[in-house]
Curated annotation (Swiss-Prot):
The gene is rpsF. NCBIfam families: S6. The keyword Ribonucleoprotein applies. GO terms for molecular function: small ribosomal subunit rRNA binding; structural constituent of ribosome. Belongs to the bacterial ribosomal protein bS6 family. Binds together with bS18 to 16S ribosomal RNA. This is Small ribosomal subunit protein bS6. It comes from Phytoplasma mali (strain AT). HAMAP family: Ribosomal_bS6.
Length: 94
């Protein structure tokens, strides 16, 4: 089990229900087996440093967790499928 920090950005033009649904979908990936979410924080709507998919703002969500590497692969798969998430990054902490 390794420690990870995950940050993902959602499109700014989706509603609160869609934001909540997307956060729950991502959290469900890690709510099984031995994985543990240490902190999940919705940072809200922020300006982007540059335009991504014609958006200048994005809804940021940050997570700190202990997870198996297979769950990170599953996270990346779900993010690629979900059109509401415009960018994500996974950082493995040492």
């Amino acid at each position: 089990m390794k420690k990870y920090e995950i940050l993902y950005i959602m499109r700014p033009n989706i509603g609160d229900e869609e934001i909540k649904k997307n956060v729950e979908t991502i959290n469900k990936i890690f709510y099984n087996n031995e994985n543990k979410i240490i902190q999940s924080k919705e940072l809200g709507l922020k300006d982007l440093a540059y335009c991504i998919d014609k958006h200048y703002k994005g809804y940021y969500v940050s997570m700190f967790l202990n997870a198996m590497p297979q769950m990170i692969e599953e996270f990346n798969r779900v993010v690629k499928i979900n059109e509401d998430i415009i960018r994500s990054i996974v950082i493995k902490e040492e």
